[in-house]
Structure formats: structure tokens, C-alpha cells
Amino acid sequence: MKATFGGGCFWCTEVIFQNTEGVTSVLPGYMGGHIDKPTYEQVCTGTTDHVEVVELEYDDELVNYEDLLKIFFKTHNPTTLNRQGNDVGTQYRSVVFYHNEEQQILAKNFIDELENEDVYEDPIVTAVEPAATFWLAEDYHHNYFNDHPENPFCSVVIAPKLQKFLKEFKA
């Protein structure tokens, strides 16, 4: 099964799903824009309309789509438009890209439940859009956290997020 999420910097999202049981592949890339084969530099200009995403392959006998949605919403801020923390731009917007009608329904229902339960103080701005062409990110973005733990962004932003995830979902 396939799932695609945009939740800010793909370095953050990638390592979370790499540590999720049942997820067999996590690839960083770009989706949702209007040019073919975008580069990181082009996407960062904010003019291509692409989102930094991770495309997952998962075994639905080990993890279901609702579990992936729960992880996605717990590990980023779905209430900030075009921003995650200090990362600002349309490439960081919160998006669930669905691959079939069931995923679309599950994502919309999940967001409705969060809104009805007042889980967040502010309204959820996460978009639910049909999956488009997935453009694989440049090689140096792959496995970024694990390959660059000394990078300040990794140690200050990603490591605490990963620890929080591991504490909550691996306990």
C-alpha cells in the first residue's frame, strides 16, 4: 500500500515513518506542483507549488492507514498555514495526498474528528488532495537525519521530535 504526506520539512517526516512498524519504504520528494522534475532549489522559491512530501510503502497487515494518519497529525502542526516551526513557505504546507477514495474518506473523517474533539486550539489547515506525480528528491535528502545527526537542524529540531514520537508510539 502507498501513502503520501506533506508535513513540513521532509527530513523530519522521513525519520518518523522510518521508525514506524509496518512501513517498508520512505522516500522524500515533491508533489502537487506545476513543473516536471523540480529541484530542491526550485521548490524552495515557492513558485512551483510543490510540497515537500514523503511517499510511504506500508504493509497494511502491520499498520493501517488510520494509524499513519494519527502519526502524521501527532508529529507536525496541522494548524499553521505554509509553515512548520521556523520553516516557512508553501513547500512546507500540511497535506494528505490520497491514492484512492478510501484514503480520501479516511483522511477527511480523521480531520473532522480532530476538529470535533477540539484537539487543537486553532483550526486544522491540512489539505486533502489527490496524489499527483511524485518527484523523488535529490539523493542528499535521503535518510538525512540518520546520515547527518551532527547537523544543527537535526539535533535541535528533528531529534526531539523523534524522541517524542518514539516515547508515544513505541512504548
Predicted regions: what is each one?
Residues 1-171:
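Flexible coil/turn and secondary-structure edge motifs
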